[in-house]
From Swiss-Prot:
It comes from Pyrococcus abyssi (strain GE5 / Orsay). Its main location: cytoplasm. This is Adenylate kinase. It catalyses: AMP + ATP = 2 ADP. Its EC number is 2.7.4.3. GO terms for molecular function: adenylate kinase activity; ATP binding. ATP binds at residues 9-17. Belongs to the archaeal adenylate kinase family. It is found in: Cytoplasm. The gene is adkA.
Length: 196
């Protein structure tokens, strides 16, 4: 018995805010895990890096080993309590887009749901421009839409290898944050009967 919900969305879509508010309202006691944070902790323990920025420079084989180690750890945790896994479906690199969760990792995690938070490119661009605390790449609306399209494609690939259901939650300025939060709470509350 395990219940894993992967939540993803490109920077500026409102994923962190929606996640935080949904966790306050759900009946299930989820453990929120950021996949990248856990990978970084493992890399520091192994003496591979000192700073988060060094992670991208590790050889691909070492990164894959870290991903598998973290996936196994999360899979074990999910036997005790439901997991909400915050991660990137795709990662924009200077050379192209990288899948955030390779085949072996998604098979190990075996998620129940893959939730994608989306908004219009103009909304995302506006949020990024207003959020001066974050150092984000400047992208055009077309590039933002391409990234969201690739996230959907990645989610389909992940679902094919895990039988997860895909849920797309739209976080539009006019729709309201409240509706997006309620949609996520509905998904999270499904975990209650799994751990009863």
């Amino acid at each position: 018995m395990s219940f894993v919900v992967i939540i993803t969305g490109i920077p500026g879509v409102g994923k962190s805010t929606i996640t935080r508010l949904a966790l306050q309202r759900t009946k299930a006691k989820f453990k929120l895990i950021n996949f990248g944070d856990l990978m970084f902790e493992e890399a520091v323990k192994a003496g591979l890096v000192n700073h988060r920025d060094e992670m991208r420079k590790l050889p691909l084989e070492i990164q894959r080993d870290l991903q598998m180690k973290v996936a196994k750890k999360i899979s074990e945790m999910a036997r005790q309590q439901p997991i909400l896994l915050d991660t990137h479906a795709t990662i924009k690199t200077p050379h192209g887009y990288l899948l955030g969760l390779p085949y072996e990792v998604i098979k190990t995690l075996n998620p129940n749901f893959i939730v994608i938070i989306e908004a219009t490119p103009s909304e995302i661009l506006g949020r990024r421009l207003r959020d001066l605390k974050r150092d984000r790449d400047v992208e055009t609306e077309e590039q933002i839409q391409r990234h969201q399209d690739l996230n959907r494609a990645a989610a389909i690939a992940y679902a094919m290898h895990s039988n997860a259901l895909i849920k797309i939650i739209e976080n539009h300025e006019d729709k309201g944050l409240e509706e997006a939060v309620n949609e996520l709470v509905e998904i999270l509350d499904l975990a209650v009967k799994e751990y009863a």
